[in-house]
Amino acid sequence: MMGKEEEIARIARRLDKMVTKKSAEGAMDLLRELKAMPVTLHLLQSTRVGMSVNALRKQSSDEEVVTLAKSLIKSWKKLLDASDAKARERRRGGSLPTSSSKEASEAQDPSRKRPELPRMPSTPRITTFPPVPVTCDAVRTKCREMLTAALQTDHDHVAIGADCECLAGQIEECIFRDVGNTDMKYKNRVRSRLSNLKDAKNPGLRRKVLCGAITPQQIAVMTSEEMASDELKEIRKAMTKEAIREHQMARTGGTQTDLFTCGKCRKKNCTYTQVQTRSSDEPMTTFVVCNECGNRWKFC
């Protein structure tokens, strides 16, 4: 008979296939199975079923599927929130269960005393981060709250099992240590992290930060270019190549003319070069440089 973990993992794999094939046929039955199961945080983390359900929710156009998927994610988020609350209580030195009654009974009856075994955590985390120093600074506290909200975008933290509050505190602490104060440089640094972590077109960055592939120390000092999505990096790379090519073409000579009017300075002192940039049966591309202000443009 299949165990609970294997059963949930099987459902997760089937949901992943549906997302890949862009077909939600049978999804409701699988989601109902999950709804009927007593899922723990440990099972969520070990099977990553939360990510599978969330991916289906984002892709599906079936209202019933979306509604049930949202309901599951909401109920699982409560498990994570409860675990986070316990972790915060431990970090703040909250009251721990007293063992005085147990010690008293053992003192009365020494035979009942048994050697204690090391306790295993009931809800192990996949992604853990060291404790973050507490701050009383209002600006820093607000920045930590905003970073926490950014990390919680799209519920990826539920599936990964990350403590967003602790992670946000680590990121803010690294930014503060690098900058040294909460002036404009600090605020701009935090602002750029927020926009990139919340970017719907760049979920990969947020997931890498949540699972620890990108550390708080790294995300705290990364440039906008380094945080950009792979797609945007490719676009920037292509644009840089194109700009270099145009610059090189303009420097290799050309024909001076007064046939073109510069859109920037409105003068007609220009140099143009015609290059076959596409197939031989396509029109040539004309590159124009204004000799007065240096403005460059092209047309076919």
Swiss-Prot record:
Every TFIIS N-terminal domain range: 6-83
Q: Where is this cross-link: Glycyl lysine isopeptide (Lys-Gly) (interchain with G-Cter in ubiquitin)?
A: K58
Primary location group = nucleus
Q: Tell me where in this chain the TFIIS central domain is found.
A: 139-255
Q: State any single GO MF term.
A: DNA binding
Cellular localization per UniProt: Nucleus
Judging by the UniProt lineage, the source's domain of life is Eukaryota
Q: How does it assemble?
A: Interacts with the basal transcription factor GTF2B. Interacts with REXO1.
Q: Which NCBIfam families match?
A: TFSII (TIGR01385)
What is the official name of this protein in its record?
A: Transcription elongation factor A protein 2
Q: Name the species this protein comes from.
A: Bos taurus (Bovine)
